[in-house]
Amino acid sequence: MSIRPILIHPDPRLKKLCDPVESLSTEIGQLAEDMLETMYDAPGIGLAAPQVGVTRRLIVMDCVKEAEAPPRPMVLVNPVITWSSEARSVYEEGCLSIPEQYADVERPAEVRVRWTALDGTTQEEEFKGLWATCVQHEIDHLDGKLFIDYLTGLKRQMITRRMEKLKRERARA
């Protein structure tokens, strides 16, 4: 396993529509392991393949927050939202590709998602609360959408300028 560099917005690779994973190869398994390690190291609760420069429909997440609870790492290949509730919830979202920037985003409070597991089985689960927000946020990445795309133009521009400045500072370092 290895930690991969996380792309920082603005980067055109973060805005691309990702291709489906065609086969569950050793490379896909390695990508999933690397993504989990990268996510935990960041630290974060979710990571999508395009955030590490791979335009494939693969996400990882683990939204367990309780200190004494065991981790629940999840790998979702080709995830699809099959149902979303009419009820909405608002969470303050952040993103590993938009470091230290947070904003309230409204999304469906509950969603049902179907995906392929690394062992090739089809899985389906209903997510609520933070898990629902996270899975929707990560699936958005697969469609080239960032959480700041839900914000007003002015807020989005301000955050983008901050990220451009951060990238310039990191390039100088």
What are the language-model segments listed below?
Residues 1-173:
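Positively charged
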